[in-house]
Every structure is written in C-alpha cells, then in structure tokens.
Amino acid sequence: MLIGSHVSPQDPLAAAQAEGAEVVQIFLGNPQSWKAPKPREDAAQLKAAALPIYVHAPYLINLASANNKVRIPSRKILQQTCDAAADIGAAAVIVHGGHVADDNDLDEGFQRWRKALDQLQTDVPVYLENTAGGEHAMARHFDTIARLWDVIGDTGIGFCLDTCHAWAAGEQLVHGVDRIKAVTGRIDLVHCNDSRDAAGSGRDRHANLGAGQIDPELLVAAVRAADAPIICETAEEGRKDDIAFLREKLNS
C-alpha cells in the first residue's frame, strides 16, 4: 500500500524524498484559475520517474453545472489538465463532483457529467472525489454518488475517497468504504485527512492526523479497508509524521 502526500509542484521528486513519500499528488497550475497548465521543463524526468504522480484538477471545475459559462470552461480545463497530466506520465487526474442549482436538477447534473466524460479524450484515468459540503452536490453523500454512478460508471471513471470530506458530509468512514466499493467496485485512491471540524459539519478543513476530530485509529481502519494508494493532503509541517504514522500502523 503506497503512502504519500500532496506536495508543491515545484520539485515533486525532491519533495517526495524529503517526506518519505512513495507516491505524490500535485497541481499542474493554479487550482483557482481557468488557465491551462503550462508545459513543464521537467516533464520527461517526471514521466521517467518510478514515483507515481497523481494530478488534482482545478477546484473551479463543475461538470454538472447548467450554466454554460461554468460547464464549458470546466470541460475545457479538465481536458487541458488531462493533456498536461499525460505529458508527465501521471497515474490519474482527480476531480471534484461539482453541484447543481437544486435537488430537482440532480438527474440533469448526472447527464451533464456523462456528456463531459463521453467527450473527454485522454488515456489518463480520471477519478471522481467525494466532497465535504455544498447544497445539491453531485458527490457529497454516498447515496447521490450511487445515483451518479448509475449514469457514469461504465465510462471507466475511478473513485477517490477523501476521509475528511466523508466525515464532514456525515458519512461513516469504515462502513462508507464498504458502501462505496459496493457502488463503484473499488476505491482507486484515498485522501487520508483528519478534520478540524465535527462530523456532519459540511466544512472542508483538513488537519494533520491526530490533530483533528477524527480518531486516528478510525482513519487507519478506513484506509486499510480501502486498500488503495494513500495521499495525505495535510499541512506541510507534520505531514512527514502523518506518512510515518500510517506506514507504522498499516505495516504492523
């Protein structure tokens, strides 16, 4: 079970070595921008490296939106991100589920997701990540994810489970792993994060493991059950300890 972290994109290989990470995740551009990622001078080096590198797509992406000024740029930047991810030999691109205007629009949001995936041209796997809050979200609650998966599950899309997000959404972690696997057939990646807030808060505020509201042993049980590569999206100070903690617990 590979354990690593979300690191600065400046030098992912050096960051991985410094943190003892066996796998990393990076942004390829500004996560709050519609601008396409710039070509990387080290693309060939990253592609040749043995280190698995995951890419997180920009936060602005909302493939479910009925608003053309949001949905169309979302499709475009996802394609551009996948193209840039292919250039570095990325293991996958992770994207949030987005949301619609009201619950009556959920089914239409599912179909917009389907259309976006059908139009996407990439050999890089794309993983849907569950989200912490937001009204009328595509991927906040596992029941909604199941409905979405009925529409997009045969496209080859994968799933990334974020423990902080599941906690914030009020979902049970270990039982939630079983529920998600029953829907998707597998979990492809885990974002193992503690939460600064109470269960069901809807707030997406990560904490280092043991410094938040989630019992560290519960996190260990969840990632063990998920049986997938692990990325800690926690604060840089303490992240090396997060990796070491998980490695000790999961290898014992």
Curated annotation (Swiss-Prot):
One GO molecular function term? DNA-(apurinic or apyrimidinic site) endonuclease activity
Q: Which InterPro entries match?
A: AP_endonuc_2 (IPR001719), AP_endonuc_F2_Zn_BS (IPR018246), Xyl_isomerase-like_sf (IPR036237), Xyl_isomerase-like_TIM-brl (IPR013022)
Cofactor(s) this protein requires = Zn(2+)
Q: Which reaction does it catalyse?
A: Endonucleolytic cleavage to 5'-phosphooligonucleotide end-products
Pfam families, per the entry: AP_endonuc_2 (PF01261)
Q: Which UniProt keywords apply?
A: DNA damage, DNA repair, Endonuclease, Hydrolase, Metal-binding, Nuclease, Zinc
* Enzyme Commission number(s) from the entry: 3.1.21.2
Biological process (GO), any one: base-excision repair
Disulphide bridges, residue numbers:
none
Q: Which residues bind Zn(2+) 3?
A: 165, 204, 206
What remark does the entry make about the cofactor? Binds 3 Zn(2+) ions.
Q: Detail which positions bind Zn(2+) 2.
A: 129, 162, 191, 233
Task: Summarize where Zn(2+) 1 binds, as residue positions.
Answer: 56, 96, 129
- Record flagged with keyword Membrane: no
The family assignment reads: Belongs to the AP endonuclease 2 family.
**Functional summary from the UniProt entry:** Endonuclease IV plays a role in DNA repair. It cleaves phosphodiester bonds at apurinic or apyrimidinic (AP) sites, generating a 3'-hydroxyl group and a 5'-terminal sugar phosphate.
Name of the featured protein:
Probable endonuclease 4
Q: Which organism is it from?
A: Mycobacterium marinum (strain ATCC BAA-535 / M)
Q: Which gene encodes it?
A: nfo
